Amino acid sequence: MAHENVWFSHPRNFGKGSRQCRHCSSHSGLIRKYGLDLCRQCFREKAADIGFNKYR
């Protein structure tokens, strides 16, 4: 088996490796609530466009 066949060949069906940000494909700091699937950095950029308001 060549390196290309081995790399990322393990199935990622659950856990942090199975989910990624829909905007930047990052695996860290993911906000999954309400089906957002955005990392926290992208959420801060896109929150106003989505319709979230900051009251404080």
Swiss-Prot record:
Entry keywords, A to Z: Cytoplasm, Ribonucleoprotein, Ribosomal protein, Zinc
Cofactor(s) required, per the database record: Zn(2+)
GO biological process: one example: cytoplasmic translation
Entries under InterPro entries matching the protein: Ribosomal_uS14, Ribosomal_uS14_CS, RIbosomal_uS14_euk_arc, Ribosomal_uS14_sf
Protein localization: Cytoplasm
Keyword Cytoplasm: yes
Binding site for Zn(2+): 21, 24, 39, 42
Domain of life: Eukaryota
One GO term describing the cellular component: cytosolic small ribosomal subunit
UniProt GO molecular function: structural constituent of ribosome; zinc ion binding
Role summary: Component of the ribosome, a large ribonucleoprotein complex responsible for the synthesis of proteins in the cell. The small ribosomal subunit (SSU) binds messenger RNAs (mRNAs) and translates the encoded message by selecting cognate aminoacyl-transfer RNA (tRNA) molecules. The large subunit (LSU) contains the ribosomal catalytic site termed the peptidyl transferase center (PTC), which catalyzes the formation of peptide bonds, thereby polymerizing the amino acids delivered by tRNAs into a polypeptide chain.
Quaternary structure annotation from Swiss-Prot or TrEMBL: Component of the small ribosomal subunit. Mature ribosomes consist of a small (40S) and a large (60S) subunit. The 40S subunit contains about 32 different proteins and 1 molecule of RNA (18S). The 60S subunit contains 45 different proteins and 3 molecules of RNA (25S, 5.8S and 5S).
Family, similarity comment: Belongs to the universal ribosomal protein uS14 family.
Name of the featured protein: Small ribosomal subunit protein uS14
